[in-house]
């Protein structure tokens, strides 16, 4: 018998984008358990997993609108990965109609919850002219204080910070460079 994933293990898989591969590797044996945890217990990580399975037809018949609904439920409970993925989907028009303003809302929430992918994508949208200049300081602050050991990502962050800085008042930049806890 295949063991059901712990919440922490599932969140780790979601963050590494291996959650759907794991369900398939487990030969789709946990579908009913996953659905129950999403539907009855309303566990955010399981709502996200179930939503992703439905959206892409992994081990179940594809039902994209139901899948997005479960992802939205997980996002509404504050799951950073769900907020980031919905933001990415709206930014790119994946499964949903492209809506970059809506993407900013989801990505801002995920970015505030320290999701680095969301922080980067949010600044990309700001640099494209979406969002509010009032949010630049927070976005700069989060990205400025981010930590990554990926050299390419580090260079991208530095480049984005330099570009965002040009759109900001010098005082806002100074304030944004404060340490994370202040």
Q: Residue spans of the language-model regions?
A:
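Alpha-solenoid helical repeat scaffolds
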Residues: 35-36, 72, 108, 144, ...
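Structural signature of tandem alpha-helical TPR/SEL1-like repeats
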Residues: 23-32, 61-70, 97-106, 133-141
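Alpha-helical protein-protein interaction scaffolds
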Residues: 113-117, 121, 139, 163
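Hydrophobic face of amphipathic alpha-helices that form TPR/SEL1-like repeat modules
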Residues: 12-16, 49-56, 85-92, 121-128, ...
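Extended, hydrophobic/aromatic-rich amphipathic alpha-helical segments that build helical scaffolds
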Residues: 48, 82-84, 120, 136-141
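Terminal, low-structured helical/coil segments at or just beyond the last alpha-helical repeat
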Residues: 153-182
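N-terminal leader/linker segments that initiate helical-solenoid repeat arrays
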Residues: 1-39
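Short helix-capping/linker turns of helical repeat alpha-solenoids
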Residues: 5, 39-47, 56-58, 63, ...
């Amino acid at each position: 018998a295949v063991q059901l994933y712990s919440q922490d293990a599932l969140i780790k898989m979601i963050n590494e984008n291996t959650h759907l591969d794991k369900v398939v590797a487990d030969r789709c044996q946990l579908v009913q358990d996953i659905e129950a945890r999403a539907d009855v217990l309303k566990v955010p990580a399981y709502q996200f997993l179930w939503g992703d399975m439905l959206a892409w037809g992994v081990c179940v018949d594809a039902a994209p609108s139901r899948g997005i609904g479960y992802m939205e439920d997980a996002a509404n409970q504050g799951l950073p990965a769900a907020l980031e993925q919905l933001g990415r989907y709206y930014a790119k028009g994946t499964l949903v109609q492209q809506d970059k303003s809506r993407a900013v809302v989801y990505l801002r929430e995920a970015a505030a919850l320290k999701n680095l992918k969301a922080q980067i994508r949010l600044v990309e949208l700001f640099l494209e002219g979406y969002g509010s200049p009032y949010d630049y300081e927070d976005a700069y602050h989060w990205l400025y204080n981010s930590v990554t050991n990926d050299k390419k990502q580090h260079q991208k962050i530095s480049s984005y910070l330099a570009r965002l800085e040009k759109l900001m008042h010098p005082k806002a930049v100074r304030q944004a460079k404060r340490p994370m806890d202040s």
